[in-house]
Amino acid sequence: MKKKYLSVNSNYVLYKTEELLDAASNRYKITVQIANRAKRRRYEDIDLLEEVTLKPIVRAVLEMAEEISQPEIISD
């Protein structure tokens, strides 16, 4: 069964990704953090019966970009 995802403006996602990378001191570390969050979210969403609205990687990028005002999350 193929999951249906909500369409998100790709330019907005790219902008938020660049915002995250600019704020991070280590690009590799923030990339790994995003991947781990997306992976964790993917396995959490398996248990949910409702439809998933965003792909896990996109959701992780957008969530972390929103949390950019909290520097302790990025500097971990």
Swiss-Prot record:
Query: Which reaction equation describes what this protein catalyses?
Result: RNA(n) + a ribonucleoside 5'-triphosphate = RNA(n+1) + diphosphate
SUPFAM superfamilies from the UniProt entry: RPB6/omega subunit-like
EC primary class: transferase
The entry lists its GO molecular-function terms as: DNA binding; DNA-directed RNA polymerase activity
UniProt subcellular location: Plastid, Chloroplast
Task: Extract one GO BP annotation from the record.
Answer: DNA-templated transcription
Could you say which residues form the signal peptide?
none
Q: Which UniProt keywords apply?
A: Chloroplast, DNA-directed RNA polymerase, Nucleotidyltransferase, Plastid, Transcription, Transferase
Report one GO cellular component.
mitochondrion
- Which InterPro entries does this UniProt record tie to the protein? DNA-dir_RNA_pol_omega, Pol_omega/Rpo6/RPB6, RPB6/omega-like_sf
| Enzyme Commission number(s) | 2.7.7.6
Sum up the protein's function in the record's words. May be involved in RNA polymerase activity.
Family, similarity comment: Belongs to the RNA polymerase subunit omega family.
UniProt cross-references to HAMAP family, sorted A to Z: RNApol_bact_RpoZ (MF_00366)
Q: State the name under which the record lists this protein.
A: Putative DNA-directed RNA polymerase subunit omega
Q: Which organism is this entry from?
A: Guillardia theta (Cryptophyte)
